[in-house]
């Protein structure tokens, strides 16, 4: 009835940003639709483990409420291998095919040069700086990994609709709403502005991959170096601090996680076969305490600061 022939019609045809040849456009569009199926498959894995996706329900302090079975893990392993094969066959080649048409994006969306990753996916050492995607930060664009101190984290409310001014550590701040109307020069948002020692920090896939690369993760080094080589800019890691670099980082991170998922599934299956079926270590809630959990969400660094008083 609308006259629109499909979901991708009536776009900005003729715009100079449309650089791909028609064959590559068709291929990328077909693969985009395939990607929706792969995304659903990944969500299905998370739902099996966590009851639903997103916001899974099986993680509790001390372990998990999910009881894995060999049948369930075999099904997960099959889906993991399907996803990993698709990443190798479609996702990686597509990005390398499209990227040469947009090399100018390596000079657009440049980062401020400050990057932070709390790290995610524990390895055997249980050290945050040795996670699959390790903890670390870089400052002022210098390719040197520093270890962040959570005590340096603050949240500013100068331009937020909350009581208070300036920046405070999460343990010290309050969240008392105070709506004063919209003013671009004063207060204009319900969002607080996190800072590290007063600095703005970029978080997300690019910082995570950069930390893995600089920490010496062999897979990250191989993939970053080969990507730069394929783009004709070997060794120029600083070009990743850009719009193009963020796209490349998403691909590299996806491949690292896809490989690790197969390894993790096999490890759990091995534990069950060896009789190691412990799921949960009970913990007594103290009368008073405070603590912080530092992790990663897909969008970037995530911190939860908690204070317990009277067991609450």
What do these predicted regions represent?
Residues 292-312:
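Active-site and channel-lining beta-strand-loop segments
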Residues 1-299:
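Active-site bordering "gate/hinge" segments
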């Amino acid at each position: 009835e609308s006259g629109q022939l499909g979901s991708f019609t009536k776009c900005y045809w003729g715009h100079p940003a449309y650089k791909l040849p028609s064959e590559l456009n068709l291929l990328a569009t077909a693969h985009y639709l395939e990607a929706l199926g792969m995304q659903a498959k990944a969500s299905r894995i998370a739902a099996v483990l966590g009851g639903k996706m997103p916001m899974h329900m099986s993680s509790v302090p001390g372990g998990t409420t999910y009881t894995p079975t060999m049948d369930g893990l075999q099904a997960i392993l099959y889906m993991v291998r399907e996803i990993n094969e698709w990443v190798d066959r479609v996702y990686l080649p597509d990005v390398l095919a499209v990227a040469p048409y947009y090399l100018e994006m390596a000079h657009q969306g440049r980062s401020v040069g400050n990057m932070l990753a709390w790290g995610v996916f524990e390895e055997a050492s249980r050290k945050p700086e040795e996670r699959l995607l390790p903890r670390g930060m870089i400052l002022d664009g210098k390719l040197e990994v520093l270890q962040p101190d959570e005590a340096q984290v603050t949240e500013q409310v100068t331009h937020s609709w909350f009581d208070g001014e300036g920046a405070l550590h999460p343990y010290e701040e309050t969240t008392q709403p105070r709506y004063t109307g919209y003013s671009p020069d004063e207060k204009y948002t319900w969002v607080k502005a996190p800072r590290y020692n007063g600095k703005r920090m970029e978080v997300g896939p690019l910082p995570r991959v950069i930390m893995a690369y600089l920490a010496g993760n062999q897979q990250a080094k191989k993939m970053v170096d080969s990507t730069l080589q394929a783009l004709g800019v070997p060794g120029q890691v600083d070009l990743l601090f850009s719009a193009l670099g963020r796209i490349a980082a998403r691909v590299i991170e996806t491949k690292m996680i896809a490989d690790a998922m197969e390894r993790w599934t096999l490890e759990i299956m091995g534990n069950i076969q060896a009789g190691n079926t412990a799921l949960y270590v009970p913990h007594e809630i103290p009368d008073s305490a405070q603590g912080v959990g530092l992790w990663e969400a897909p969008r970037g660094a995530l911190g939860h600061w908690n204070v317990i008083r009277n067991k609450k």
